[in-house]
């Protein structure tokens, strides 16, 4: 009985996620559903009724059953959301084999079980369970994991996520394009001025949009903020807002100056997906990247022809050697009603076999030490570069609410598009607005205490 219910649930959800059924569409008739799924209509009707209760479908008397608008935002039991990741088909295969009751989502934006990136998890931590009890129960061999990586994700005394894979960020570059431009190969101790000289040399041969991946997103500009010695917040400080500190402003100004140097006409870079394709095809020169990026590159038809190398992100004068942590973290939402399944899911994802497999694909560095040792090759120049950057990793986003996350990502992203000489003034305005927001939030918290 249960297997039939799982089969029809998968069938119906796949109709939605493949686009065969859209919001407002009427479900096919009983005869077609029975024929295509191979399950009796009695079982189909039971699953449909459950999905009606879950807000996926709605039944209209004398008209039939229809797909709800906005079904993608519903959170279904026994679902795993990681829809933006490039290896989702392989993960689906692994989970389906051992835990067939879990549906791996392609289009649902949230699941009971999820992989989330670092800055998103910090800002939405209160939506997730404390996983420390699960970690201690499921992984008694805890010395076989990079335990220090758990510390950043303990917020208000609770472990909101377990790093599944992680990586420092470096600067990837294409040796062939450097050679053709007559540009010296960069070295790990290069300065910001060295980097700008490199940009100018590359501009002789390469279109500005193909020199480096310049984007407004947090995980781009944050690299120069931390390399300049800046940060976003310091929760323990009397004034925790550091967006308008001199170091942070310097990093943002440098990032804006890079845009101005590349695009003096006021335009911006290529869309992220377009640049990634250009880089994979060997037509773009440099990219800020964690090891996860290598997996995407390998999927491109021209991957074997790339002459890839890696170097530390340049350090501005007076800055610090720092590399922002990039991680995919396993999380469980608070509305999980089946922790047994959660434990089984965690055991599978952090098993030696699964960690070994994804480590060897080049997708990040596994959280399991033995898998990381197998994945990182000492005779591979890029792997050695990622290894040497691990001690430099920092993770001090310290953005602990969705509202604050939106203020920072949208606000600072907009700053980066301003003329560089206006960055300081507008950073102070943004920081003051955030201070007001934090005071209001603190006041409300005291009133409800």
PLM region descriptions:
Residues 49-92:
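HTH-adjacent hinge/linker in prokaryotic transcriptional regulators
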Residues 56, 258-336:
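Extracytoplasmic/periplasmic substrate-binding proteins
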Residues 120-170:
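Hinge/lid segment of periplasmic solute-binding proteins
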Residues 196-241:
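Extracytoplasmic/periplasmic solute-binding protein
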Residues 238-269:
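Glycine-centered hinge/linker elements that transmit conformational signals in sensory
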Residues 328, 332-400:
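Mature extracytoplasmic/periplasmic domains
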Residues 381-444:
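C-terminal capping/gating helix-and-loop segments adjacent to ligand/active sites or protein-protein/ligand interfaces
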């Amino acid at each position: 009985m249960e297997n039939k219910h799982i089969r029809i649930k998968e069938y119906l959800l796949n109709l939605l996620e493949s686009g065969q059924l859209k919001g407002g569409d009427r479900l096919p008739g009983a005869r077609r559903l029975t024929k295509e799924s191979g399950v009796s209509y009695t079982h189909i009707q039971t699953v449909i009724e459950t999905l009606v209760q879950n807000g996926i479908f709605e039944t209209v008397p004398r008209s039939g059953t229809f797909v709800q608008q906005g079904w993608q935002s519903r959170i279904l039991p026994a679902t795993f959301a990681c829809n933006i990741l490039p290896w989702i088909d392989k993960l689906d295969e692994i989970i389906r084999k051992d835990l067939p009751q879990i549906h791996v989502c392609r289009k649902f934006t949230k699941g009971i079980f999820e992989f989330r990136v670092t800055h998103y998890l910090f800002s939405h931590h209160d939506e997730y369970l404390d996983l420390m009890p699960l970690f201690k129960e499921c992984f008694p061999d805890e010395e076989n994991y990079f335990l220090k990586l758990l510390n950043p994700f303990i917020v208000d005394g609770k472990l909101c996520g377990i790093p599944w894979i992680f990586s420092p960020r470096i600067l990837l570059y294409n040796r062939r394009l450097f050679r053709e431009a007559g540009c010296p190969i960069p070295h790990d101790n290069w300065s910001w001025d060295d980097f700008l000289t490199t940009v100018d040399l590359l501009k002789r041969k390469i279109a500005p949009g193909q020199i480096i991946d310049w984007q407004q997103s947090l995980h781009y500009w944050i690299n120069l903020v931390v390399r300049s010695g800046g940060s976003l917040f310091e929760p323990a400080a009397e004034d925790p807002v550091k967006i308008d500190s001199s170091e942070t402003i310097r990093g943002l100004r440098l990032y804006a100056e890079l845009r101005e140097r590349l695009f003096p006409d006021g335009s911006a870079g290529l869309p992220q997906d377009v640049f990634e394709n250009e880089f994979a095809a060997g037509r773009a020169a440099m990219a800020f990247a964690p090891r996860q990026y290598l997996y995407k590159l390998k999927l491109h038809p021209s991957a074997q022809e790339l002459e890839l190398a890696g170097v530390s992100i340049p350090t501005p004068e007076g800055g610090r050697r720092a590399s922002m942590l990039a991680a995919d973290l396993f999380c469980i939402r608070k509305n999980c009603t089946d922790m047994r399944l959660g434990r089984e899911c965690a055991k599978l994802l952090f098993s030696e076999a699964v960690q070994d497999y994804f480590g060897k694909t080049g997708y990040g560095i596994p959280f399991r030490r033995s898998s990381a040792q197998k994945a990182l090759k000492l005779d591979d120049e890029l792997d050695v570069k990622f290894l040497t950057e691990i001690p430099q990793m920092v993770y001090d986003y310290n953005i602990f609410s969705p509202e604050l996350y939106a203020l920072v990502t949208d606000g600072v992203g907009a700053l980066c598009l301003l003329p560089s000489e206006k960055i300081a003034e507008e950073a102070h305005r943004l920081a003051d607005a955030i201070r007001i927001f934090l005071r209001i939030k603190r006041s409300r918290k005291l009133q409800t205490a």
